[in-house]
From Swiss-Prot:
Domain of life: Bacteria
The protein, known as: Aerobic respiration control sensor protein ArcB homolog
Mode of membrane association: Multi-pass membrane protein
Periplasmic side stretches: 48-57
Gene (name only): arcB
Entries under Pfam families matching the protein: HATPase_c (PF02518), HisKA (PF00512), HKR_ArcB_TM (PF18415)
Residues passing through the membrane, by range: 27-47, 58-78
Subcellular localization: Cell inner membrane
Residue list for modification Phosphohistidine: H131
Taxonomic lineage: Bacteria, Pseudomonadati, Pseudomonadota, Gammaproteobacteria, Pasteurellales
Presence of the UniProt keyword ATP-binding in the record: yes
One GO CC annotation: plasma membrane
Species for this entry: Haemophilus influenzae (strain ATCC 51907 / DSM 11121 / KW20 / Rd)
PROSITE patterns on file: HIS_KIN (PS50109)
Catalytic activity, reaction form: ATP + protein L-histidine = ADP + protein N-phospho-L-histidine
Length: 325
């Protein structure tokens, strides 16, 4: 089969090299000779005599019809060869495209592997930093809290409150940064456990009052009666959400007050933060929970990173609850 294809292709190449006109003339000559020889042999073996009239008639018929047959045959061969060349070109182009796609896919795979490795390295680094960072930070918070229970004058107490609240705030900021990476990797988890709810609210009140006092604002809690003393929740995550909301309210409130209102609807609790700040336009409210978004109308463009509210919304949704402006 391979030899047949080889000889067929060689024949086609030979026809193409000769050209349509020369091949037609050569074909006519060959057919004329064949027709003459065939007629002579036929006459000798069948009739036992040579009829020159029949020979002349056969040769004349062949010479009249052969050029057309050979011409169209040559035309067909040329078209088939052009089609073969076009097909071969298309196959080569397709092979090149496949090779390019394979190379591009290989590069993409290598880039993804590198990205995954960088992500793993980043996660490992953040986990290490988190451990190394929280240990001394918790020590600062704990020791400052112990010292606040001693007898101190007003100046000393204010200094210690500043240290305590600053350490707590720094911890929440660092939690936002850690959670930012966990949210991207869909690895954030909740740690629900029985929590002293009044103690949690007291901690919130202490740092919120301190933040508000620095700007001559008034912070207050509005609690619905008969709230339970113990709740099964993630204390760290809830504190993180409330810290983001309250600190955001403090940043964008120049005068007046900030209120944290807590209401209960059966087993659902609503935490509402109100302030007397400049407010946010309805158009801006559509975007404030987007990652890295900052209010354009704000006079304090550099006041935050734009991740606190976005992370808080993700945490609230992880708890199975809504988060609205």
């Amino acid at each position: 089969m391979k030899n047949f294809k080889y000889f067929a292709q060689s024949y086609v190449d030979w026809v193409i090299r000769l050209g349509r006109l020369r091949f037609s003339l050569l074909g006519v000559m060959i057919l004329a000779v064949l027709a003459l020889c065939t007629q002579i042999l036929f006459s000798l073996f069948i009739v036992h005599q040579i009829s020159w009239v029949d020979i002349f008639r056969s040769v004349t018929f062949g010479l009249l019809t052969a050029p057309f047959v050979i011409y169209f045959f040559t035309l067909l061969v040329e078209k088939l060869e052009h089609s073969r060349l076009d097909l071969s070109s298309s196959v080569n182009r397709l092979e090149n495209e496949v090779a390019e796609r394979i190379a591009a896919q290989k590069k993409l795979s290598q880039a993804l592997e590198k990205l995954e490795k960088n992500s793993r390295d980043k996660s490992t680094l953040l986990a290490t930093i988190s451990h190394e960072f929280r240990t001394p930070l918790n020590g600062i918070v704990g020791l400052s809290q112990i010292l606040l229970d001693d007898e101190l004058d007003d100046l000393q107490r204010n200094y210690l409150k500043t240290i305590n609240i600053s350490a707590v705030s720094l911890g929440y900021i660092f939690s936002d940064i850690i959670d930012l990476e966990k949210i991207d990797a869909s690895r954030i988890e909740l740690n629900r456990q029985p929590t002293d709810f009044p103690a949690l609210l007291n901690d919130i009140y202490n740092f919120a009052s301190f933040l508000a006092k620095e700007k001559n604002l008034i912070f207050s809690l509005e609690l619905e009666p008969n709230l339970p003393n113990w709740l099964n929740l993630d204390r760290v995550r809830l504190s993180q959400i409330l810290w983001n909301l309250i600190s955001n309210a403090v940043k964008f409130t120049d005068q007046g007050n900030i209120i944290l209102k807590i209401m209960r609807n059966q087993d659902c609790y609503h935490f509402i933060v109100k302030d007397t700040g400049m407010g946010i336009s309805p158009e801006e409210q559509k975007h404030i929970f987007e990652m890295y978004y900052q209010v354009k109308e704000s006079r304090q463009q550099s006041a935050g990173s734009g991740i606190g509210l976005a992370i808080s919304k993700n945490l609230a949704q992880l708890m199975g609850r809504g988060f609205n402006s």
